[in-house]
Amino acid sequence: MALDTSTKAQIVSDFQRAQGDTGSPEVQVALLTARINGLTGHFKANAKDHHSRRGLLKMVSQRRKLLDYLKGRNVDSYRALIERLGLRK
């Protein structure tokens, strides 16, 4: 599901490194996580929506790639991000 403008702006302001930062891996992962969480609710009501499921899998893959990139560049930032988003147990 697409995020509305106010939700997206809130996520960007929470995870940006500096003012106006929208492209850092932290922001991109947070936005993808919000979209993924929105789609998981959609699949509870629409279990046979395979077209959207493919999009979900692409988003999960993109998030995984960004997290791998961030882990290679800055492990402390990676750990802080997954803690804030609640991605790992």
Swiss-Prot record:
Protein name in the entry = Small ribosomal subunit protein uS15
Organism equals Azoarcus sp. (strain BH72)
Listed under subunit, the entry gives:
Part of the 30S ribosomal subunit. Forms a bridge to the 50S subunit in the 70S ribosome, contacting the 23S rRNA.
- Gene Ontology BP terms: translation
Coiled coil where?
none
Molecular functions per Gene Ontology = rRNA binding; structural constituent of ribosome
Which keywords does UniProt give here?
Answer: Ribonucleoprotein, Ribosomal protein, RNA-binding, rRNA-binding
Looking up SUPFAM superfamilies in the UniProt record yields: S15/NS1 RNA-binding domain
Q: Pfam families of this UniProt entry?
A: Ribosomal_S15 (PF00312)
Domain of life, per lineage: Bacteria
What does it do? Answer: One of the primary rRNA binding proteins, it binds directly to 16S rRNA where it helps nucleate assembly of the platform of the 30S subunit by binding and bridging several RNA helices of the 16S rRNA.
Q: Name the family.
A: Belongs to the universal ribosomal protein uS15 family.
Q: Which gene encodes it?
A: rpsO
Gene Ontology annotations for the cellular component aspect, listed alphabetically: cytosolic small ribosomal subunit
